[in-house]
């Protein structure tokens, strides 16, 4: 199945209030901030969105709110994955109801499912989505599910699978997948190797740090498209300096703290068992947020974004 969703797609965080309840006002502001950055698509309800710390009703409400706020301005991919096929089917139906362009699902994890069981799981979700294309989400480091290249080749040929989100540092495998399936849309998942992933054959990326500096990833995407490897490397290094700071503070909490300091969300809260950023890291993040927001404003005034 052909899929045209290429380029830079933000993996959307879920803002919470101080009671760890979903903050829909902040969610809407975050969507608008992505649009300001000239981001054209959102990946909703994935790892960055803390989906596995939410119940099905909450996940469905997020899908509804994002669709409402986006109002046709963005390509929307609904991550509906989880351990339970039945719950994923419910969310796939919701994605169809709210007008999403595609669904996505991580491989079911925790239990040692067979490859055949994984394939059945995906087919059932796809059938529930009533014609929506599927983006398979492969993230072996967190799911614990490690498919061979032959298994990936089989998985992406399931009817209505149109894309693969490949969150892996194995660039050789990424190149092999693209060579074997040139029609498949391939997304790079690790933000820190976005430029390298594009060179290896990715058609775009889905990432969490796009929310705080999406314009940089757009520059990388354009640079690689124009064969300007030096520019792409320069911008990737700039992104990786931010990512290095986030790793030291905790990536998800760090991203939310930056968004909080930038005035985009009302609190930097993640759901338990995630911890808040330690006080010793706050000053560094505050100064980084100021620099990023100033850079965003400059780009906006220069109409770069």
From Swiss-Prot:
Organism: Escherichia coli O6:H1 (strain CFT073 / ATCC 700928 / UPEC)
Domain of life: Bacteria
UniProt keywords, alphabetically: Carbohydrate metabolism, Cytoplasm, Lyase, Schiff base
Assembly mode: Homotetramer.
Catalysis: reaction(s): aceneuramate = aldehydo-N-acetyl-D-mannosamine + pyruvate
Protein residues bound to aceneuramate: 47-48, 167, 189, 191-192, 208
Lineage: Bacteria, Pseudomonadati, Pseudomonadota, Gammaproteobacteria, Enterobacterales
Function: Catalyzes the reversible aldol cleavage of N-acetylneuraminic acid (sialic acid; Neu5Ac) to form pyruvate and N-acetylmannosamine (ManNAc) via a Schiff base intermediate.
A GO BP entry: N-acetylneuraminate catabolic process
Name of the molecule in the record: N-acetylneuraminate lyase 2
Listed pathway(s): Amino-sugar metabolism; N-acetylneuraminate degradation; D-fructose 6-phosphate from N-acetylneuraminate: step 1/5
């Amino acid at each position: 199945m052909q899929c045209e969703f290429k380029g830079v797609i933000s993996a959307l965080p879920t803002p919470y209030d101080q009671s760890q309840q979903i903050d829909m006002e902040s969610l809407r502001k975050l969507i608008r901030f992505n649009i300001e950055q000239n981001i054209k698509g959102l990946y909703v309800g994935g790892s960055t969105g803390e989906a596995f710390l939410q119940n099905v009703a909450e996940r469905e409400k997020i899908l509804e709110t994002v669709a409402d706020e986006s109002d046709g301005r963005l390509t929307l991919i609904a991550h509906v994955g989880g351990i339970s096929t039945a719950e994923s089917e419910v969310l796939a139906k919701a994605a169809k109801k709210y007008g999403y362009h595609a669904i996505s699902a991580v491989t079911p994890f925790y239990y040692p499912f067979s490859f055949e069981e994984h394939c059945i799981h995906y087919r059932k979700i796809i059938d529930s989505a009533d014609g929506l294309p599927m983006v398979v989400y492969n993230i072996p480091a967190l799911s614990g599910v490690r498919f061979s290249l032959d298994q990936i080749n089989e998985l992406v040929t399931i009817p209505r699978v149109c894309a693969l989100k490949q969150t892996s540092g194995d660039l050789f495998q990424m190149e092999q997948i693209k060579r074997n399936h040139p029609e498949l849309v391939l997304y790079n998942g690790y933000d820190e190797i976005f430029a390298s992933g594009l060179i290896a054959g990715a058609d775009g990326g889905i990432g969490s740090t796009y929310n705080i500096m999406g314009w940089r990833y757009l520059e990388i995407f354009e640079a690689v498209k124009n064969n300007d490897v030096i520019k792409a490397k320069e911008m990737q290094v700039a992104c990786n300096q931010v990512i290095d700071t986030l790793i030291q503070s905790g990536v998800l909490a760090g991203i939310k703290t930056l968004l909080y300091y930038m005035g985009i969300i009302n609190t930097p809260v993640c759901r338990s068992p995630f911890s808040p950023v330690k006080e010793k890291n706050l000053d560094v993040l505050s100064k980084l947020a100021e620099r990023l927001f100033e850079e965003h404003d400059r780009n906006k005034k220069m109409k770069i974004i």
